[in-house]
Protein backbone atom coordinates (compact mmCIF):
# COMPACT_ATOMS: atom_id res chain seq x y z
CA UNK A 1 0.00 0.00 0.00
CA UNK A 2 1.00 3.61 -0.54
CA UNK A 3 -0.31 7.06 -1.43
CA UNK A 4 -0.83 8.37 -4.96
CA UNK A 5 0.99 11.69 -4.74
CA UNK A 6 0.11 14.22 -7.39
CA UNK A 7 3.60 15.76 -7.45
CA UNK A 8 5.66 13.03 -5.83
CA UNK A 9 8.77 14.34 -4.12
CA UNK A 10 10.12 17.00 -6.50
CA UNK A 11 11.76 17.54 -9.87
CA UNK A 12 15.40 18.40 -9.32
CA UNK A 13 17.31 21.18 -11.05
CA UNK A 14 20.76 22.60 -10.37
CA UNK A 15 21.38 26.29 -10.92
CA UNK A 16 24.54 28.20 -9.99
CA UNK A 17 25.72 25.20 -8.00
CA UNK A 18 22.56 24.90 -5.90
CA UNK A 19 19.67 22.46 -6.01
CA UNK A 20 16.28 23.88 -6.96
CA UNK A 21 13.09 21.91 -6.35
CA UNK A 22 10.13 22.08 -8.71
CA UNK A 23 6.81 20.22 -8.79
CA UNK A 24 7.02 16.90 -10.61
CA UNK A 25 3.67 16.78 -12.43
CA UNK A 26 4.15 13.17 -13.48
CA UNK A 27 0.42 12.40 -13.62
CA UNK A 28 -0.18 15.03 -16.27
CA UNK A 29 1.77 12.92 -18.76
CA UNK A 30 0.22 9.72 -20.03
CA UNK A 31 0.99 7.00 -17.49
CA UNK A 32 -0.87 3.78 -18.29
CA UNK A 33 0.36 1.67 -15.38
CA UNK A 34 -2.09 2.78 -12.70
CA UNK A 35 -5.68 1.55 -12.83
CA UNK A 36 -8.42 3.40 -10.96
CA UNK A 37 -10.72 1.23 -8.82
CA UNK A 38 -13.36 3.78 -7.89
CA UNK A 39 -15.94 1.21 -6.80
CA UNK A 40 -13.60 0.09 -3.97
CA UNK A 41 -13.28 3.47 -2.27
CA UNK A 42 -13.08 3.80 1.51
CA UNK A 43 -14.11 6.71 3.75
CA UNK A 44 -11.50 8.04 6.17
CA UNK A 45 -12.95 10.06 9.03
CA UNK A 46 -11.16 12.92 10.74
CA UNK A 47 -12.95 14.90 13.42
CA UNK A 48 -13.10 17.97 11.15
CA UNK A 49 -13.71 16.29 7.77
CA UNK A 50 -14.43 13.03 6.00
CA UNK A 51 -12.27 12.06 3.01
CA UNK A 52 -12.81 9.61 0.16
CA UNK A 53 -9.87 7.25 -0.37
CA UNK A 54 -9.83 6.17 -4.02
CA UNK A 55 -7.59 3.17 -4.81
CA UNK A 56 -5.35 2.90 -7.85
CA UNK A 57 -3.54 -0.34 -8.64
CA UNK A 58 0.00 -0.37 -10.00
CA UNK A 59 1.48 -3.68 -11.23
CA UNK A 60 4.86 -4.62 -9.78
CA UNK A 61 6.70 -6.98 -12.08
CA UNK A 62 9.84 -9.01 -11.53
CA UNK A 63 12.42 -10.49 -13.86
CA UNK A 64 11.77 -14.07 -14.94
CA UNK A 65 8.71 -14.56 -12.73
CA UNK A 66 5.29 -15.94 -13.60
CA UNK A 67 3.26 -13.59 -11.45
CA UNK A 68 2.73 -9.88 -10.94
CA UNK A 69 2.31 -8.13 -7.60
CA UNK A 70 -0.01 -5.19 -7.07
CA UNK A 71 0.79 -1.98 -5.24
CA UNK A 72 -2.42 -0.25 -4.18
CA UNK A 73 -2.12 3.53 -3.97
CA UNK A 74 -4.74 5.77 -2.32
CA UNK A 75 -5.78 9.16 -3.69
CA UNK A 76 -7.58 11.64 -1.42
CA UNK A 77 -10.78 13.18 -2.78
CA UNK A 78 -13.37 15.36 -1.01
CA UNK A 79 -16.87 14.18 -0.18
CA UNK A 80 -18.17 17.22 -2.08
CA UNK A 81 -16.08 18.61 -4.91
CA UNK A 82 -17.58 22.11 -4.93
CA UNK A 83 -19.67 24.27 -2.58
CA UNK A 84 -22.19 25.73 -5.01
CA UNK A 85 -23.93 27.89 -2.39
CA UNK A 86 -20.66 29.54 -1.37
CA UNK A 87 -19.71 30.18 -4.98
CA UNK A 88 -23.14 31.60 -5.78
CA UNK A 89 -22.77 33.93 -2.79
CA UNK A 90 -19.53 35.18 -4.37
CA UNK A 91 -17.39 33.53 -1.69
CA UNK A 92 -15.26 31.99 -4.41
CA UNK A 93 -12.34 30.86 -2.25
CA UNK A 94 -14.71 29.25 0.27
CA UNK A 95 -16.30 27.22 -2.54
CA UNK A 96 -13.14 25.16 -3.00
CA UNK A 97 -11.67 25.38 0.51
CA UNK A 98 -12.53 21.81 1.56
CA UNK A 99 -11.52 20.39 -1.80
CA UNK A 100 -8.05 21.92 -1.64
CA UNK A 101 -7.56 20.87 2.00
CA UNK A 102 -8.33 17.28 1.03
CA UNK A 103 -6.14 17.38 -2.08
CA UNK A 104 -3.25 18.56 0.11
CA UNK A 105 -3.22 15.10 1.72
CA UNK A 106 -1.88 13.47 -1.44
CA UNK A 107 -0.32 16.49 -3.10
CA UNK A 108 3.35 16.11 -2.06
CA UNK A 109 5.48 13.49 -0.34
CA UNK A 110 6.98 14.70 2.97
CA UNK A 111 5.54 18.23 3.14
CA UNK A 112 7.53 20.68 5.23
CA UNK A 113 6.54 20.15 8.88
CA UNK A 114 8.49 22.99 10.47
CA UNK A 115 5.19 24.69 11.36
CA UNK A 116 2.16 23.39 13.25
CA UNK A 117 0.07 23.42 10.06
CA UNK A 118 2.72 21.30 8.35
CA UNK A 119 2.67 18.81 11.20
CA UNK A 120 -1.11 18.55 10.97
CA UNK A 121 -0.81 17.73 7.27
CA UNK A 122 1.88 15.10 7.89
CA UNK A 123 -0.27 13.34 10.48
CA UNK A 124 -3.32 13.58 8.21
CA UNK A 125 -1.33 11.86 5.48
CA UNK A 126 -0.27 9.08 7.82
CA UNK A 127 -3.74 8.45 9.20
CA UNK A 128 -5.38 8.59 5.77
CA UNK A 129 -2.92 5.96 4.53
CA UNK A 130 -3.31 3.49 7.40
CA UNK A 131 -7.07 3.86 7.84
CA UNK A 132 -7.92 3.22 4.18
CA UNK A 133 -5.52 0.27 4.01
CA UNK A 134 -6.73 -1.36 7.22
CA UNK A 135 -10.37 -0.96 6.24
CA UNK A 136 -9.63 -2.85 3.04
CA UNK A 137 -7.65 -5.59 4.79
CA UNK A 138 -10.51 -6.14 7.23
CA UNK A 139 -13.09 -6.22 4.43
CA UNK A 140 -10.98 -8.76 2.52
CA UNK A 141 -10.62 -10.91 5.64
CA UNK A 142 -14.36 -10.84 6.33
CA UNK A 143 -15.14 -11.81 2.73
CA UNK A 144 -12.87 -14.86 3.00
CA UNK A 145 -13.19 -15.89 6.66
CA UNK A 146 -16.37 -14.38 8.09
CA UNK A 147 -17.07 -11.70 10.67
CA UNK A 148 -15.07 -13.13 13.60
CA UNK A 149 -11.94 -10.97 13.53
CA UNK A 150 -10.17 -12.69 16.40
CA UNK A 151 -8.13 -14.65 13.86
CA UNK A 152 -7.28 -11.64 11.69
CA UNK A 153 -3.59 -11.91 12.60
CA UNK A 154 -3.46 -15.53 11.44
CA UNK A 155 -3.95 -14.38 7.85
CA UNK A 156 -2.44 -10.87 7.94
CA UNK A 157 1.02 -9.59 8.82
CA UNK A 158 1.70 -5.87 8.53
CA UNK A 159 5.26 -4.56 8.38
CA UNK A 160 5.69 -1.03 9.71
CA UNK A 161 8.62 0.34 7.73
CA UNK A 162 9.76 3.15 10.05
CA UNK A 163 7.40 5.20 12.21
CA UNK A 164 5.28 6.84 9.49
CA UNK A 165 2.56 4.12 9.46
CA UNK A 166 2.56 3.49 13.24
CA UNK A 167 -0.86 5.14 13.52
CA UNK A 168 -2.06 1.82 12.12
CA UNK A 169 -1.76 0.36 15.62
CA UNK A 170 -4.39 2.54 17.35
CA UNK A 171 -6.46 2.61 14.14
CA UNK A 172 -6.65 -1.20 14.01
CA UNK A 173 -7.67 -1.16 17.68
CA UNK A 174 -10.39 1.39 16.87
CA UNK A 175 -11.71 -0.59 13.91
CA UNK A 176 -11.77 -3.85 15.84
CA UNK A 177 -13.48 -2.36 18.89
CA UNK A 178 -15.73 0.39 17.53
CA UNK A 179 -16.65 -1.02 14.12
CA UNK A 180 -16.56 -4.76 14.78
CA UNK A 181 -17.41 -5.20 18.44
CA UNK A 182 -14.26 -6.71 19.95
CA UNK A 183 -13.31 -5.92 23.52
CA UNK A 184 -9.98 -4.33 24.40
CA UNK A 185 -8.22 -7.58 25.31
CA UNK A 186 -9.23 -9.39 22.12
CA UNK A 187 -8.39 -6.37 19.97
CA UNK A 188 -5.00 -6.00 21.65
CA UNK A 189 -4.25 -9.70 21.15
CA UNK A 190 -4.98 -9.35 17.43
CA UNK A 191 -3.09 -6.08 17.05
CA UNK A 192 0.07 -7.20 18.85
CA UNK A 193 0.24 -10.31 16.67
CA UNK A 194 -0.38 -8.41 13.42
CA UNK A 195 2.32 -5.72 13.36
CA UNK A 196 6.08 -6.02 13.00
CA UNK A 197 8.30 -2.95 13.08
CA UNK A 198 11.48 -1.89 11.32
CA UNK A 199 13.38 0.78 13.25
CA UNK A 200 15.69 2.90 11.11
CA UNK A 201 17.53 4.96 13.70
CA UNK A 202 18.43 5.22 17.37
CA UNK A 203 19.08 8.97 17.22
CA UNK A 204 16.67 10.65 19.61
CA UNK A 205 16.19 13.68 17.35
CA UNK A 206 15.15 11.44 14.44
CA UNK A 207 12.53 9.41 16.32
CA UNK A 208 9.12 10.69 15.27
CA UNK A 209 7.01 12.39 17.93
CA UNK A 210 3.91 14.57 17.70
CA UNK A 211 2.23 17.02 20.03
CA UNK A 212 -0.73 15.58 21.94
CA UNK A 213 -2.80 18.50 20.65
CA UNK A 214 -2.51 17.22 17.06
CA UNK A 215 -4.14 13.93 18.01
CA UNK A 216 -6.83 15.69 20.01
CA UNK A 217 -7.59 18.00 17.10
CA UNK A 218 -7.62 15.44 14.27
CA UNK A 219 -9.03 12.29 15.89
CA UNK A 220 -10.07 12.33 19.52
CA UNK A 221 -10.92 8.62 19.53
CA UNK A 222 -7.40 7.70 18.39
CA UNK A 223 -6.06 9.90 21.18
CA UNK A 224 -8.19 8.02 23.72
CA UNK A 225 -6.82 4.69 22.49
CA UNK A 226 -3.22 5.94 22.59
CA UNK A 227 -3.79 7.20 26.13
CA UNK A 228 -5.13 3.79 27.16
CA UNK A 229 -2.17 2.02 25.54
CA UNK A 230 0.11 4.30 27.56
CA UNK A 231 -1.78 3.63 30.81
CA UNK A 232 -1.63 -0.13 30.34
CA UNK A 233 2.02 0.04 29.32
CA UNK A 234 2.91 1.77 32.58
CA UNK A 235 1.01 -0.83 34.63
CA UNK A 236 2.71 -3.59 32.65
CA UNK A 237 6.18 -2.16 33.25
CA UNK A 238 5.49 -1.72 36.96
CA UNK A 239 4.35 -5.34 37.23
CA UNK A 240 7.62 -6.45 35.58
CA UNK A 241 9.70 -4.46 38.06
CA UNK A 242 11.04 -1.98 35.49
CA UNK A 243 12.33 1.11 37.26
CA UNK A 244 10.00 4.12 36.89
CA UNK A 245 12.54 6.36 35.14
CA UNK A 246 13.21 3.82 32.39
CA UNK A 247 9.52 3.01 32.03
CA UNK A 248 8.70 6.70 31.69
CA UNK A 249 11.38 7.27 29.04
CA UNK A 250 9.97 4.50 26.83
CA UNK A 251 6.32 5.29 27.48
CA UNK A 252 4.13 5.99 24.42
CA UNK A 253 2.99 9.35 25.82
CA UNK A 254 5.11 11.67 27.91
CA UNK A 255 6.20 15.29 28.12
CA UNK A 256 3.19 16.38 26.09
CA UNK A 257 4.09 14.29 23.05
CA UNK A 258 3.10 10.99 21.43
CA UNK A 259 6.17 8.86 20.72
CA UNK A 260 5.51 6.77 17.63
CA UNK A 261 8.56 4.51 17.92
CA UNK A 262 7.67 3.48 21.48
CA UNK A 263 4.10 2.63 20.43
CA UNK A 264 5.52 0.46 17.65
CA UNK A 265 8.01 -1.27 19.95
CA UNK A 266 5.38 -2.06 22.57
CA UNK A 267 2.67 -3.26 20.18
CA UNK A 268 4.71 -5.22 17.61
CA UNK A 269 5.50 -8.92 17.74
CA UNK A 270 8.87 -8.42 16.03
CA UNK A 271 11.35 -5.54 15.75
CA UNK A 272 14.33 -5.29 13.45
Residue ranges and their predicted role:
Residues 1-272:
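A conserved ligand/cofactor-binding region detector
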Amino acid sequence: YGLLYRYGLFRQEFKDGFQREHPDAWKESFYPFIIRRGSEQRIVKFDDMHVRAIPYDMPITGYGTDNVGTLRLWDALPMHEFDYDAFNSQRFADAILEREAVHDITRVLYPNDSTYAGKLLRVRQQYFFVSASLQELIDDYRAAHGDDLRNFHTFNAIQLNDTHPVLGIPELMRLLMDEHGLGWDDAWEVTTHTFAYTNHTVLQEALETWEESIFKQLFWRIWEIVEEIDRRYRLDMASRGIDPETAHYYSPVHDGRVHMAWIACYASYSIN
